[in-house]
Each structure stands twice: as structure tokens, then as C-alpha cells.
Amino acid sequence: MRKLTYLLCMPLLFLGQTGRSQGCIAIRNLAGFGQFAQLGYAQTKDKWMMDVDNRYFAAHTVLFGRTNETPADLSSGVSLHEWTTNFEITRLLPNDWSITLDVPVSSNETLGKLEHAQLYYHVTHAFGLGDIRFSVNKWLLTKVSNRGNIQVGLGIKFPTGNYHSEDYFYEDPNNPAAATLAPVNVAVQLGDGGTGFTTQINGFYILSSAVNLFGNFFYLISPRDQNGVQAWVPGSIPPSFFALQQQTTADVNSVPDNYTMRGGANFTFDKLVATTALRYEGVPAHDLFGQNDGERKAGHIFSAEPGLQYKFKKSLLYAFVTIPVDRETIQTVPDQRATKITGTYMITGGHFANTLFFVGYSFTF
């Protein structure tokens, strides 16, 4: 009998960084996550798996808590656009072990007048390599007769992405050509500047030849507190408010944890597979380890995620779209400090995706 190998394709973004953002709220690229395994067991003599995953989102919805404060004239605010291609290669090892290297490349931009003193409509941009992640994974059940399995993985995220990307900002009312070089919005930075540690759990259960269930959990632990990059951009906040930011540590970007949970079902129709899933993801206000200083866009997103996959002999083509159900920003530690100082409830706003979809191709060799 040929050795039975559980195949797991894990398109991980990051998007830019391993914990990237849906606008200002972190999101992981889990669309298509675990699809080979979720479609059942696969017999293979191949030793490698490759996944090329592409993500695009556009965001202009601005929430403070659950209150929508998106400007009627979108050009007066900030819109976010991100394109990320993730290259992930997995080496299959004996006894259901595997190792994975995840390399993201991103092109991110903000558009609008808000970052340019409400005077000029401009684009700020960041392009390049994101934060690379390496992980070791193990399937826990080895019996061929099992209708399901659970995989656990531990990894490390390296600060390879530029977390100090800069572009030009225009805020001189007397000279439209005058520009200030400064760090771009944290939502479009390519990395977070911290070495992180990841834990993940993936599982599936085969109900029948046509239906199987799956679940995924991912958590990025970021021990570093702040990365030293200024959190504000020229022209985006009043000078008086910046003094409050300094007092509460919100003037410098944080290096936050982030998490994703996802579960759903696959329905197989010969080579075509329809997937329906729910996903919950976000950035906590308090990290598991370390301090919680600095500017972070804390909050969570609950979404529905339908998708289609097409199976070939040794490969898989997939496309997913996320549909937001509930979105909320929450108070950060600097927000709580500002509330205490001013006596007024303070909360950091966050952008949320209005368009978000994933397209990818996975294969073994």
C-alpha cells in the first residue's frame, strides 16, 4: 500500500506582514486554508506542496466601535487598497510532519485628502517583501481508517517586511508641490517590526463522499511592544491632539498580536467543490505577553466566506470572497489612558474592507 499522506495547503498572507490588516484591523489570509485536507485524504508520492495565493481588498468604511463615521465625500477621508501575493512552499516529511515557508509580497496604498491636510487628493504607497514565516506542523492521527484528523503547528515570524515605509505628504496650502517625507499609514506598512511566534490548529472530518467539515485556528504572539515608527502622518491630526498621543504612547506604532478562527463545510460535485465558512478575526487590545503601549487598531470582524474550488489531479484552483456580518473597533490601552486624562470617552477608529477576495492555485510535486 502506498503511504497515505494528509495534504494541507495553507495560503498565509500575509499580506505583507504575517498579521496583515483588513484596512486597519488585522486579518489573516485563511481563504483556501487547508483545502487539500478538507477535501479528504490524498495518496501521493510527492514531497512538496506549493501555494500561490492572491488577495485584494479595498476599504473606506470607518467605524468607531460600531458607529459608522465614513465621510459622505470619500475623497475627504482615506481609502485603503492592498494587493498581496503569497508564496508558500511546504516540505512533506515522514510520519505526518511537514515544514512550511511563507513569503508574502505586497503593494499597498492609501488615497484621499485626510493625510494631506484636507487640501490635496494624493496617493501614498508601499511595495515590497512582507514578514516571512516558518512553521513546523504535525498531523496527530495516523490511522488510515480515520475519517478526520487534527494538525498542530508552531512557527516563527521574522521582521523582514519594511515597517518604516515612507512616502510624500502634501500639506502646504501655498505650495501644492511642497512635500514632507514621512512613514505611511500603519495599515499599509509591509511589516510590523517584531519577531513573532505563531500557533495554529487545523482539522477536518469527512461526513460522506460529498460533504466534509473543517476548522482552523491561528494566533500570532508578538512580544515586542512598539516599533519606534511614528503613528501619525502629517496633516491627519491637529497638533494639540498629538500632545495627548505622546502622553498616552499612541504616537508610536504598536506591534500587536492577532488571531483568526474559521470553520465551515465543503460540498463536492465531482471536481467542483462549493465551500461555505464563517470566520472571526481581529487584533486584541491586550497581548498575551509584553506591554500594550502604542497605536494599534484593535477590534474584530465576523464574516461569511463562500467560495469555489476546482480539483485537478495534483492541484487545486480556488476563489473566495468575504461578506462582513459584524465589525467593531475596541478601546486600546492608550485610548483608556486618554479617556482618563480628558474625561471623554476615546476610541481609535478603524477602516474595514468593502471589497475582499482571494484567488489561488495549489499543487504538489
Give the location of each predicted region.
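Outer-membrane beta-barrel biogenesis signature
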Residues: 19-64, 69-71, 141-151, 159-164, ...
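Repeated loop/turn-to-beta-strand initiation elements of outer-membrane beta-barrel proteins
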Residues: 48, 61, 97-99, 143-145, ...
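Bacterial Sec-dependent N-terminal signal peptides
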Residues: 1-24
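Outer membrane beta-barrel transmembrane domains
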Residues: 63-72, 220, 225-365
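Short sequence motifs at beta-strands and strand-loop junctions characteristic
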Residues: 77-82, 124-130, 189-196, 253-257, ...
